[in-house]
């Protein structure tokens, strides 16, 4: 039995090729424990050429409130970040539900609200000219008491370039 477990462990080590898997608490690098990574989306393919982008949903361990951010990375270099609202303090029941790759970039899906109104927002981010741009926002408002659902499509007149620090609450308007 012990030999079988040892063999399984050795095979697993070779399969991982020395890469360590941490579930729950990952950091951007071994010496940087500031970020608690909750989700990572690797963007690869013909659209991006030889570049390897990562979109990461992280929490700041140095912040008392553990504020969330969406980090845009080109390799190991961060070139933009979305500052997310604090749950229940700045935005009731705010949560990042998913990051999904699309044909032209990626989509960030967030929900917030509770009681009378529940919101689902889809931020559509497109990649063109070697940059990411916020292209459109799809908002769904659901009123549980009335059983109504309203969907709003907002295409940006001038797409917002993902560069530097951007606060998400500004995008909710």
Role assignments for model-derived ranges:
Residues 4-14:
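Sec-dependent N-terminal signal peptides
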Residues 20, 24, 28, 102-173:
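Acidic, small-residue rich beta-repeat scaffolds with periodic aromatic anchors
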Residues 25-47, 91-104:
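Beta-propeller blade termini
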Residues 46-58, 101-112:
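Acidic/hydrophobic-patterned starts of short beta strands in beta-sheet-rich repeat architectures
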Residues 65-82, 124-128:
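Beta-propeller blade repeat segments, especially FG-GAP/WD-type strand-to-loop junctions
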Residues 65-67, 94, 117-122:
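Short, surface-exposed coil-to-beta transition loops
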Residues 77-102, 109-113:
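Structured domain cores in non-transmembrane regions
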